[in-house]
């Protein structure tokens, strides 16, 4: 699969036609989706829209997949929940609106866990999404369908969003690039009242340049999202042409609390020190507060509040593992919800010291390799018992702080499974994270390696 930036140039130059490209994508979906289960709804008008595409626009008819919790006018948007089984929005999300204005053709909607609540892509409506690198293993989540579609080579770009790791975890498990932009960088409207203050819109791509291209087209303030940030009046895509120089990078294998698969740790350590070409890399010992319980408390209470008096109805159709969350909600109080803000400040106080001394922080993206479908996660890592979400300890801290953070492929395990490295920037330094990512991509390319399907 070529870079989206190159495909766009071919579309503009007439070397390929948008309708031909869309037809090729649909053929791949027909052939590969029965194996990986990435798509849950297709846009029946995609070919018709591609024939009308304006090749003078920035995307010139490029096909893009949209995660099924991002609303698409006239295309079913289910949130992968029985509650929304037949919901067809009357307006586009801001993200989709901007993509269409830029000339994108929406090819369809991608699979995810119900309401995007967990980092494992499965639900009662559509079933699990399978990892193209090993069909017996998970893609993670919650942007799992999008990651599978791009990893399988169906198309170069798919949308995702990230409230606790939901772009970065699938990127790690599927061997892709996935940036969680700064909170507010891309307007988020409309959205469910879940992961409030944590949620960022973004993309899954094979190339850093393609993520930069897409963000150039969708970033910037919108009156419908009061927390959206003003646009930065420069191009990310042009900015990453220049490698960083003289940067100071801290590498932490565990943030001070994580239990990590030794193979994951070693691969990420090797990858991190490849960045010494662009500055100084130092392994550091951290002792950050772990906000795992705060994440669980926040999500559970927000979901219970959102479902409200339809709880009995939802319990009959919900993804079975969610029923445990509902039981947990009975023991939680909104006092605990409010105290999350205190813990966020504790976390940032600890991180502030790191980012006063270093420009970037590198960690593993996930503490383990992709695990088998049918499990919500491993029960232990390196022979040590972990909590139910102890396998994903590196991503959610930076949802609480709102910092930009990306997963980029660090290498592959002995079994041939992707392993991701997380690059975290200072608040609002999205362009810096993209620059470091592009620099790493240039010294450690991975894009020519594809799964066999």
Swiss-Prot record:
<dbReference type="InterPro" id="IPR023631">
    <property type="entry name" value="Amidase_dom"/>
</dbReference>
<feature type="active site" description="Acyl-ester intermediate">
    <location>
        <position position="166"/>
    </location>
</feature>
<dbReference type="GO" id="GO:0004040">
    <property type="term" value="F:amidase activity"/>
</dbReference>
<dbReference type="Pfam" id="PF01425">
    <property type="entry name" value="Amidase"/>
</dbReference>
<dbReference type="InterPro" id="IPR036928">
    <property type="entry name" value="AS_sf"/>
</dbReference>
<keyword id="KW-0378">Hydrolase</keyword>
<dbReference type="InterPro" id="IPR020556">
    <property type="entry name" value="Amidase_CS"/>
</dbReference>
<comment type="similarity">
    <text>Belongs to the amidase family.</text>
</comment>
<protein>
    <recommendedName>
        <fullName>Putative amidase AF_1954</fullName>
        <ecNumber>3.5.1.4</ecNumber>
    </recommendedName>
</protein>
<feature type="active site" description="Charge relay system">
    <location>
        <position position="67"/>
    </location>
</feature>
<dbReference type="InterPro" id="IPR000120">
    <property type="entry name" value="Amidase"/>
</dbReference>
<feature type="active site" description="Charge relay system">
    <location>
        <position position="142"/>
    </location>
</feature>
